[in-house]
């Protein structure tokens, strides 16, 4: 069984990491159900294991080092953070590439509800949209596994202040931009979005 937790207040980043680390240990020991956690962070940057100082342009917000994959990304209001704590071993899916593909298909299917065509790129993890001939990222992935239990996850841009990305080179990809559902003309509440996330999740996971 997979539980869902929705946090309506901004969640401190360090608190979220400590929570996830405790939770995945419980899941591994069969002391807790799997969990999908939906939240928002206050404005901040996170540095994945591939992050370098070259990707920082200006320190507009606090920077948190984290053990997830990837480089620098931004988190803040108007962005739906999706942290997934799933036991891939119990699901007989001990395949990281398959997990990333499943995450991608999930978000692509969610975006279809809003007439947004999301795309998965093998060489650029995340979900991309073609906005007037320009490829822009609408959802960033940063995952980590411990004993085949996942944590960290997805940042989906609903209506964030996109200028906040200007302090970094997002995911180390300087030739590509970022976008949001709002920028693409879609206005949706997080509550509405969460309902679709749940609906589509159960079709893949």
Curated annotation (Swiss-Prot):
GO terms for cellular component: cytoplasm. The keyword Transferase applies. GO terms for biological process: protein modification process. It catalyses: octanoyl-[ACP] + L-lysyl-[protein] = N(6)-octanoyl-L-lysyl-[protein] + holo-[ACP] + H(+). Keywords: Acyltransferase, Cytoplasm, Transferase. Substrate binds at residues 68-75, 140-142, 153-155. Catalyzes the transfer of endogenously produced octanoic acid from octanoyl-acyl-carrier-protein onto the lipoyl domains of lipoate-dependent enzymes. Lipoyl-ACP can also act as a substrate although octanoyl-ACP is likely to be the physiological substrate. In the reaction, the free carboxyl group of octanoic acid is attached via an amide linkage to the epsilon-amino group of a specific lysine residue of lipoyl domains of lipoate-dependent enzymes. HAMAP family: LipB. This is Octanoyltransferase.
């Amino acid at each position: 069984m997979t539980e869902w937790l929705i946090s309506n207040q901004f969640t401190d980043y360090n608190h979220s990491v400590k929570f996830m680390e405790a939770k995945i240990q419980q899941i591994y020991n069969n002391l807790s159900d799997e969990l999908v956690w939906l939240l928002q962070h206050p404005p901040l940057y996170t540095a994945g294991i591939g992050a370098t100082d070259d990707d920082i342009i200006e320190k507009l917000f606090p920077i948190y080092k984290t053990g997830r994959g990837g480089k620098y990304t931004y988190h803040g209001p108007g962005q739906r953070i999706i942290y997934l704590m799933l036991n891939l071993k119990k699901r007989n899916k001990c395949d990281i590439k398959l997990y990333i593909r499943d995450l991608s298909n999930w978000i692509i299917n969610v975006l279809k509800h809003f007439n947004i065509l999301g795309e998965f790129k093998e060489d650029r993890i995340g979900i991309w949209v073609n906005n007037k001939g320009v490829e822009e990222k609408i959802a960033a992935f940063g995952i980590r596994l411990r004993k085949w239990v996942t944590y960290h996850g997805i940042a989906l841009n609903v209506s964030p202040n996109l200028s906040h990305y200007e302090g970094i080179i997002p995911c180390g990809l300087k030739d590509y931009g970022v976008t949001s559902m709002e920028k693409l003309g879609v206005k949706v509440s997080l509550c509405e979005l969460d309902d679709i996330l749940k609906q589509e999740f159960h079709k893949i996971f």
